[in-house]
């Protein structure tokens, strides 16, 4: 270990593993360590089930009705991949897809007036949906056609809207959309967690709705994908990529000290040995003095023996509870997967509810989601701090990832990856850069 590296990475969360993979593909010498004996950090999938009980201090062993412990891979964070989103692009460009199998999530649902409705995924479904009345549907369709044709580089598609100046609120007004439809569009399609976006320039929102529509168009049932065997497979896929390009991996490595000289990182000490480096990437848990708390997320993992009611017995789905519906500032999310994804014993379902904490009683805040899941066989509650780096890391060359937020997709995580990449290299993140070199040594399939 007493060697000189270009980059040392601490923690094997998704952000760290993707950056480690990209740096290795770009010819950097990378050492990647984790204090845990497993991959994934905060974004791990826990197996066997007994380990989940231990992690959440639940007394006793899982009951026999839960089946074999090793049939379970339980994600600590609830996320899906947008079929046309940035993470899927990263997987395709790096060919990490060869190590993974995905399934399309069966449906996306939205909560309105105490009930859940399917988010329409085809024009026929939209016309039949009881989410909105007939005239509202016509106006909404006009709005969707406008969004589909919109191109921020072609003023002919603007129809009097200035993408950099016109607020999204004004665009909704232009199409005469009602409050329910605005809630549904902003939260179930554009996937905003709060309503702050209404007063921002509309370009970002329109592009988010386009991403949703394009993702949906790829597979038809919903815009979301989920990897077999759980989200923990994602960091492992990128770790394999890094290893193929000469990256060195060490799990179960206690990190004793990050060594800084004249304000700049020069190495990492583990088990009495020092590995030197020019740059360091890590998650917040390795540098508690360099991050600050900006909020909290509550997540409740629920084991069920039944699909969620009113989802047409879907074996996987997402439910969004828009904040307006439950008098909150932030949305509540539910992600549900099942034995169909090799993450649970036969006939069992895992539903994870999450939201940004707004009060002193987070468990009360998440109750509307838990009501939809009843009866719940076993639940595991966690409240995590949202941590962000105090500085950009350009002086110390210590680049710290953000903790995973309450959203149910990876678009914000990909934004963080691109941001760190730019700070580390001084150049914009380019998907082409991630392409495997044509004459490289391919990993075994």
Swiss-Prot record:
It is found in: Cytoplasm; Membrane; Golgi apparatus, trans-Golgi network. The modification N6-acetyllysine is found at residues 112, 269. Keywords: Acetylation, Cytoplasm, Golgi apparatus, GTPase activation, Membrane, Phosphoprotein. GO terms for cellular component: cytosol; Golgi apparatus; membrane. The modification Phosphoserine is found at residues 130, 382. It comes from the Eukaryota. It holds the Pfam family GDI. The modification N-acetylmethionine is found at residue 1. GO terms for molecular function: GTPase activator activity; Rab GDP-dissociation inhibitor activity. It is a peripheral membrane protein. One of its GO terms (biological process) is negative regulation of cilium assembly. Its main location: cytoplasm. Signal peptide: none annotated. Interacts with RHOH. Interacts with the GDP-bound inactive forms of RAB3A, RAB3B, RAB3C, RAB5A, RAB5B, RAB5C, RAB8A, RAB8B, RAB10, RAB12, RAB35, and RAB43; binds RAB3D to a lesser extent. Interacts with DZIP1; this interaction negatively regulates the interaction of GDI2 with GDP-bound RAB8A. GDP-dissociation inhibitor preventing the GDP to GTP exchange of most Rab proteins. By keeping these small GTPases in their inactive GDP-bound form regulates intracellular membrane trafficking. Negatively regulates protein transport to the cilium and ciliogenesis through the inhibition of RAB8A. Belongs to the Rab GDI family. This is Rab GDP dissociation inhibitor beta. It comes from Sus scrofa (Pig). The lineage of its organism: Eukaryota, Metazoa, Chordata, Craniata, Vertebrata. The gene is GDI2.
């Amino acid at each position: 270990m007493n060697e000189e590296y270009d980059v040392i990475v601490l923690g094997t969360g998704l952000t760290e593993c993707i950056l480690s993979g990209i740096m290795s593909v770009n010819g950097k010498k990378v050492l990647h360590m984790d204090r845990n004996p497993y991959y994934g950090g905060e974004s791990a999938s826990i197996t066997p089930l007994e380990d989940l009980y231990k992690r959440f201090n639940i007394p006793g062993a899982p009951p026999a009705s839960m089946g074999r412990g090793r049939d379970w891979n339980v994600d600590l964070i609830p996320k899906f991949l947008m079929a046309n989103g940035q993470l899927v692009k990263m997987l395709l460009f790096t060919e990490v897809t060869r190590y993974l199998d995905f399934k399309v999530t069966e449906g996306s649902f939205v909560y309105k007036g105490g009930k859940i409705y399917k988010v329409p995924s085809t024009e026929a479904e939209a016309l039949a949906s009881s989410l909105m009345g007939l005239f509202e549907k016509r106006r909404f369709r006009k709005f969707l056609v406008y969004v589909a044709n919109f191109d921020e580089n072609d003023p002919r598609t603007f129809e009097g809207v200035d993408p950099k100046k016109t607020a999204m609120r004004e665009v909704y007004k232009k199409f005469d959309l009602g409050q329910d439809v605005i809630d549904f569009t902003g939260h179930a399609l554009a996937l905003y967690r709060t309503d702050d976006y209404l007063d921002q320039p509309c370009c970002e929102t329109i592009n988010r709705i386009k991403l949703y529509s394009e993702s949906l168009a790829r597979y038809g049932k919903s815009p979301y994908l989920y990897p077999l065997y759980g989200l923990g497979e994602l960091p492992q896929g990128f770790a394999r990529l890094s290893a193929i390009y000469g990256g060195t991996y060490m799990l179960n490595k206690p990190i004793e000290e990050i060594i800084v000289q004249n304000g700049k990182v020069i190495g990492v000490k583990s088990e009495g040995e020092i590995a030197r480096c020019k740059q360091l990437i890590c998650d917040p848990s390795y540098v508690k003095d360099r991050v600050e708390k900006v909020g909290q997320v509550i997540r409740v993992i629920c084991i069920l023996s039944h699909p969620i009611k009113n989802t047409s017995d879907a074996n996987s789905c997402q439910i969004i509870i828009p904040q307006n519906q439950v008098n909150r500032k932030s949305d509540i999310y539910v992600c549900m997967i099942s034995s169909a994804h090799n993450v649970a014993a036969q006939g069992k379902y895992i539903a994870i509810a999450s939201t940004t904490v707004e009060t002193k009683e987070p468990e009360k805040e998440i109750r509307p989601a838990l009501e939809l899941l009843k009866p719940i066989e076993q639940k595991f509650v966690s409240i995590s701090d949202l941590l962000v780096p105090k500085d950009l890391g350009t002086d110390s060359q210590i680049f710290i990832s953000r903790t995973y937020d309450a959203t149910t997709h990876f678009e914000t995580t990909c934004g963080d990856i691109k941001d760190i990449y730019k700070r580390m290299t001084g150049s914009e993140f380019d998907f082409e850069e991630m392409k495997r070199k044509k004459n490289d040594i391919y990993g075994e399939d």
